[in-house]
């Protein structure tokens, strides 16, 4: 009988530790996490807004993970390089995570602000936007907020 109680106590303790570990692991997963990645443009191309992006330029891509759904977003970045722009508006290519959203990006000094708006919630993980620079760039996310119109009704 004592042996059975010890086994039950050991199983209960192991279950409790496993449950706590699960809570810690899930707490580490940030929702609406914005990540930055870099790649080199292989061939010169013309962006949708008419900006010529030369071969060898750096493509800076923002992507989202654990997307909870949003119809509007504001992302503020710090950038150590000037981004390719037309009339002060950063030349950017929308990714699949923005869906049919209207996206605008502008740079003022080291600050880059990207704003989006859509009638529908986007719940897709993946690329938000890609923009370009001809010099070495380091871009960090200062702040990112995502709002859903459906949540505010």
Predicted regions and their residues:
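Bacterial Sec-dependent N-terminal signal peptides
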Residues: 1-10
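Acidic, low-complexity intrinsically disordered segments
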Residues: 6, 28-153
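C-terminal segment of classical bacterial N-terminal signal peptides
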Residues: 17-26
